[in-house]
Amino acid sequence: MGQEMSTQSDIQNEDQKGNKRNLKGTQGKNGLKERSTSISKEIVKNSFNNSKLRPGMFIQNSNVVFNEQYKGIKILGKGSFGEVILSKDKHTGHEYAIKVISKKHVKRKTDKQSLLREVELLKMLDHINIMKLYEFFEDNNYYYLVSDVYSGGELFDEIISRKRFYEVDAARIIKQVLSGITYMHKNNVVHRDLKPENILLETKNKEDMIIKIIDFGLSTHFEYSKKMKDKIGTAYYIAPDVLHGTYDEKCDIWSCGVILYILLSGCPPFNGSNEYDILKKVETGKYTFDLPQFKKISDKAKDLIKKMLMYTSAVRISARDALEHEWIRLMTSKDNVNIDIPSLELSITNIKQFQSTQKLAQAALLYMGSKLTTIDETKELTKIFKKMDKNGDGQLDRNELIIGYKELLKLKGDDTTDLDNAAIEVEVDQILSSIDLDQNGYIEYSEFLTVAIDRKLLLSTERLEKAFKLFDKDGSGKISANELAQLFGLGDVSSDCWKTVLKEVDQNNDGEIDFKEFRDMLIKLCNY
């Protein structure tokens, strides 16, 4: 808006100096109006083309009716606020876990704020080890949160079953937790209730042991210059600085230290017969390795626990440093990721071919890649992404892309001895600028999936129809300028200006986009 006003002011000054009489005549007014409108259209087009695309933009409080969109299959679990129902999407056949929260139990203003804050945080977080929210809607009686089905159950139940974990397995789990926490802290989000009950196993496959951090009801944004004061958390895992009412994001690291201690020993470091006794022991910060279970545990593992359970948060290890701790590197260095070569070749081809400046097409593809794919469909791509993510923070930076690109070419069987490093860097820079849809300088997990996935799989009729419905808010069968403005959060701009954007796709010049035009746009983008 400021840019627009400044530009119009410059035009007026120029006209006043050059030819004042034109401002008094009808032709002069029309000329100025036309130039002003032209500039407005150019500004909205630039705003649109420069808008940042994130998967969270597609999670809006929609008018979905549960029984029309989903079929409930069975109850997966119950809690004090509601229940989680295994449900099938009637249009795509995909299964989801839907958290159904009764509004009777969300009467207090603070409870509703907590729920809405959780939704907002999940909208912005995009990480392999953080639960993915697909949809959020409500009716007169309930709120609905739609997420993936994680069939492996809680880490808590796995601990009960195993009693304790081998060091290598404990390291694999805590590395993933720390990866998620590193990403969260980098984005100024603190969880504040990390515990085995809030860590789910993606599948029942004991070899993969992919974890997902859930339950962001107590999470919040934080500022590095300010301390938090709310005394919240769970007795066994709460940090002493939280009990004292002055703490920072490293309260999450304390919780990770407690979890690692439990994984290796089967016992909590701070125990008691009731919550009061537990909290008193937490307040002292004193724990012991003088248990029979710890006799066979390496000094390096104990060293990481010590650094995580430092009483003073200022000297407590950070999430990123913990992720790079020697014990974690040692225990996970031999993790072999068996990558399917045909999937690898296809993903490299798709990434290199992805070239688009058409924001609407990018947005539609991001929605389909991030919200309409299943865990099984993205399994191989997840392996490739994790192999490229050298520092384990859940994002790919420029250096990781360069190193990873070379490694993937080797895996594919290409001879990389004569590769021109400068040429590779140029190619990586082109890839980064093309697929960094939120323009933050990194490739997020969903961005990678979106551009690397099999186009034939992604552009199925069912997925295209569901994606079209996201844009077509009123169900008219056409996407209007107003609907586009609503999705991209630029609703204060006139619909006339949006029509300049629609023209790129609007083949029959009716000022709207029908399903055929929408489908053709995506097929053209994907060279499919």
UniProtKB/Swiss-Prot annotation:
Active site: 193 (proton acceptor)
Activity regulation comment: Activated by calcium. Upon calcium binding to the EF-hand domains, the C-terminus of the junction domain (J domain) undergoes a conformational change which results in the dissociation of the pseudo-substrate inhibitory motif from the catalytic domain. This, in turn, may facilitate the autophosphorylation of the activation loop at Thr-234, which leads to the kinase activation. Intracellular calcium increase is triggered by xanthurenic acid (XA), a small mosquito molecule that induces the differentiation of specialized transmission stages, the gametocytes, into male and female gametes.
Assembly, per entry: May interact with the pre-replication MCM complex prior male gametogenesis activation.
GO biological process: cell differentiation
Name of the gene encoding the protein in the UniProt record: CDPK4
Name assigned to this protein: Calcium-dependent protein kinase 4
Subcellular location: Cytoplasm; Cell membrane
EC numbers: 2.7.11.1
Record-linked InterPro entries: CDPK_Ser/Thr_kinases, EF-hand-dom_pair, EF_Hand_1_Ca_BS, EF_hand_dom, Kinase-like_dom_sf, Prot_kinase_dom, Protein_kinase_ATP_BS, Ser/Thr_kinase_AS
Free-text note on domains in this protein's UniProt record: The junction domain (J domain) is composed of 2 motifs that maintain the kinase inactive. The N-terminal autoinhibitory motif acts as a pseudosubstrate inhibiting the catalytic domain while the C-terminal motif binds the EF-hand domains.
Needed cofactors: Mg(2+)
Predominant location: cytoplasm
KW Transcription (keyword) present: no
Job description of the protein: Calcium-dependent protein kinase which acts as a sensor and effector of intracellular Ca(2+) levels probably in part downstream of cGMP-activated PKG kinase. Plays a central role in the host erythrocytes and hepatocytes infection cycles, sexual reproduction and mosquito transmission of the parasite. During the liver stage, involved in sporozoite motility and thus in sporozoite invasion of host hepatocytes, probably together with CDPK1 and CDPK5. Involved in merosome egress from host hepatocytes, probably together with CDPK5.
Catalyzed reactions: L-seryl-[protein] + ATP = O-phospho-L-seryl-[protein] + ADP + H(+); L-threonyl-[protein] + ATP = O-phospho-L-threonyl-[protein] + ADP + H(+)
GO cellular component: cytoplasm; plasma membrane
Residues the record lists as binding Ca(2+) 3: 472, 474, 476, 478, 483
UniProt entry keywords in alphabetical sequence: ATP-binding, Calcium, Cell membrane, Cytoplasm, Developmental protein, Differentiation, Kinase, Lipoprotein, Magnesium, Membrane, Metal-binding, Myristate, Nucleotide-binding, Phosphoprotein, Repeat, Serine/threonine-protein kinase, Transferase
Pfam family, any one: EF-hand_7
Domain spans labelled EF-hand: 376-411, 423-458, 459-494, 498-528
Family stated for the protein in its record: Belongs to the protein kinase superfamily. Ser/Thr protein kinase family. CDPK subfamily.
Post-translational modification: Myristoylated; myristoylation may target it to different subcellular compartments. During male gametogenesis, myristoylation is required to initiate DNA replication but not for mitotic spindle assembly or axoneme activation.
